[in-house]
Design a protein with these regions (language model features):
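Active-site-proximal alpha-helix that buttresses catalytic centers in soluble enzyme cores
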Residues: 2-81, 120, 134
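Residue-level preference for the first positions of well-ordered beta-strands
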Residues: 4, 101-103, 139
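Short, glycine/serine-rich, charged loops/turns that create anion-binding
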Residues: 11, 56, 109, 146, ...
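Short, well-ordered alpha-helical microsegments
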Residues: 59-61, 86, 111-112
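Helix-adjacent hinge/juxtasegments
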Residues: 64-104
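A glycine-rich beta-strand to alpha-helix segment
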Residues: 101-119
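Domain-level recognition of soluble alpha/beta enzyme cores
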Residues: 119, 123-157
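Short, solvent-exposed aromatic-acidic interface loops
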Residues: 156-167
Length: 167
């Protein structure tokens, strides 16, 4: 059964004069959270075959911190994950041609909207947590009984929702 991992980038630095939103990196707590998430993903067996990562610096930095602990067969940086809505994210996932599990590193509100839309059922604690909000460096783990190319809203089972300070 393939898994879809939806990861909101870790906590970014505040905007600085002359720095575009796209170019904001992680702050110290964001780096630490992402590194810890990489450790916890490895320990839980949450290892993707494919990573689809927003091209924004904070998303790339998040993946790079996780990648110190978790390896993927293929990593793609996609500009569409910076500006798309949840429906656009779903199209990108379907079109990825992945036969295994996929990690998407992106942004809110798209992550939260997509996690809620895909997860009709799941572990109560995970469902409750994701409905309360999707924090920076939050990770939704959604399991499907079909290939990711065929997923549709309410097809998934939310098996876990990891967030900083509770990992």
């Amino acid at each position: 059964m393939p898994r879809l991992y939806l990861l909101r980038h870790a906590k970014a630095r505040w905007a600085e004069p002359g720095v575009k939103d796209y170019d904001r990196g992680l702050d110290a707590s964001g780096k630490a959270d992402a590194e810890q998430l990489g450790i916890d993903m490895l320990e839980a067996g949450y290892v993707p075959n494919l990573v689809l990562c927003s091209g924004a610096k904070r998303a790339r930095d998040t993946w790079n911190a996780i990648a110190q602990h978790v390896e993927a067969d293929d990593v793609r940086f996609l500009e569409g994950l910076y500006s798309s809505d949840a429906a656009g994210y779903l199209d990108i996932i379907r079109e990825s041609d992945s036969t295994g599990s996929v990690l998407v590193v992106g942004h809110n509100p798209m992550m939260e909207d997509l996690a809620v839309a895909l997860s009709r059922e799941g572990e109560e604690q995970a469902l409750s947590a994701v409905r309360r909000g999707f924090p920076a460096c939050g990770l939704a783990v959604i399991r499907f009984s079909t290939a990711l190319a065929e997923i549709a809203p309410e097809d998934g089972y939310l098996e876990a929702f990891l967030k900083p300070h509770s990992l």
